[in-house]
């Protein structure tokens, strides 16, 4: 496990020198922060034996980190950017991760595919406001599945603004895990349970959820 984390760090630093996957400012420190933030979920929840889809995986936070630290889970990383998906696949291959796959596709398209209603958990970090991410993530979950949203100090405001989206899409906030990260306080993982089937017309076509949030 620690070998895989070390390999991931080394590959990310190398790739970041060619393509800006994460901020280059104080990269070693920021990298540790991203990893610790991603794995913080495992202090609160057990993903063993679960199917997890990570949306907007980017450079691998939180999905790839969770796959490394939770080999008993099954992870699908969704990312539409070619360079990022190539990087994610390279790390998976180098580390020999058998529990993790990458899919290069837009989230809205996947939400209308055979993968709809098929995951136990959907994770998302630093992608968009909550009312947008709800439309991306809830269609992918089975009934009773949970959407896991990494948020900062304004999470309460985002929850208030997402009330309409929660009602339309069949979700309910059931837990909020708060924690501190290094010198940064007021971090939270907001847990949204899928209580009702999401109407078939959601997610809307590519680009619309972000352009016209519910």
Swiss-Prot record:
Domain of life: Bacteria
CC terms in the record's Gene Ontology section: cytosol
Sorted UniProt keywords: Cytoplasm, Methyltransferase, rRNA processing, S-adenosyl-L-methionine, Transferase
Short name of one Pfam family: GidB
EC code: 2.1.1.-
Secretion signal, residue range per the UniProt entry: none
Gene3D superfamilies per record: Vaccinia Virus protein VP39
Binding site for S-adenosyl-L-methionine: 56, 61, 107-108, 125
Localization (cell): Cytoplasm
The protein's enzyme class: transferase
Family: Belongs to the methyltransferase superfamily. RNA methyltransferase RsmG family.
Function: Specifically methylates the N7 position of a guanine in 16S rRNA.
NCBIfam families cross-referenced by the UniProt entry: rsmG_gidB
The protein's name: Ribosomal RNA small subunit methyltransferase G
């Amino acid at each position: 496990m620690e070998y895989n984390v070390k390999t991931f760090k080394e590959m990310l630093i190398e790739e970041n020198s060619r393509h800006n996957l994460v901020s280059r400012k104080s990269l070693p420190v920021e990298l540790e922060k991203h990893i610790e933030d991603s794995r913080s979920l495992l202090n609160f929840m057990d993903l063993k034996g679960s199917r997890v889809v990570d949306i907007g995986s980017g450079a691998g936070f939180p999905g790839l980190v969770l796959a490394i630290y939770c080999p008993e889970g099954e992870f699908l990383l969704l990312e539409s950017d070619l360079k990022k998906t190539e990087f994610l696949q390279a790390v998976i291959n180098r580390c020999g991760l058998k529990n993790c796959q990458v899919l290069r596709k837009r989230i809205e398209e996947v939400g209308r595919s055979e993968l709809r209603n098929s995951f136990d958990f959907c994770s998302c970090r630093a992608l968009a406001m909550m009312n947008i991410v709800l439309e991306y993530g809830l269609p992918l979950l089975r009934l009773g599945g949970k959407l896991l949203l990494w948020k900062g100090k304004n999470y309460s405001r985002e929850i208030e603004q997402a009330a309409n989206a929660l009602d339309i899409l069949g979700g309910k906030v059931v837990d909020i895990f708060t924690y501190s990260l290094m010198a940064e306080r007021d971090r939270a993982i907001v847990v949204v349970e899928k209580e009702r089937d999401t109407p078939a017309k959601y997610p809307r076509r590519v680009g619309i959820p972000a352009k016209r949030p519910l």
